[in-house]
Amino acid sequence: MPARILAVDDEPGMLKLLAMIIREKTPHTIETTNNPLEAVQIVRRGGIDLVIADLKMPGLDGSELLEAIRAFSEIPVIIITAYGTEEAAAETREKGVFDFILKPFRKEQIVLGIERALAWSALQRENRALKERLQPPPGV
């Protein structure tokens, strides 16, 4: 079943590139926004399976966006950046990023990151369902 992916970047060219990669190389659908605050609202409405966001954006950067999403959702977030320091990677990992991809990237890196993130998310859902089934019925 195709996933819904949200791409967030303040550069229109990067949004077009991500949309092209996802449409050409995956069965998934993509929604884009250049506004990180709008991205939080889109994710909050539900139906998004994965977020791909730039690290450096005005207003709310990718790390802050990740933190805002983590306040209410555990969907995987992939950060892409041209500013790939160990410090930035460590900070986003502490906040729960799924993957950290450096620009310039190859199309295959994005596709692999997407497929890994969606597979991880499916395993997390399956794990939660199994845990719920293993819970004893009330009163036992």
What spans do the regions from the language model cover?
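Acidic catalytic/metal-coordinating carboxylates
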Residues: 34-38, 61-64
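Active-site beta3 strand of CheY-like receiver
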Residues: 46-52
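Two-component/phosphorelay signaling modules centered on CheY-like receiver
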Residues: 12-31
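C-terminal output helix
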Residues: 87, 105-115
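Receiver (REC) domain active-site loop signature in two-component systems and cognate sites
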Residues: 57
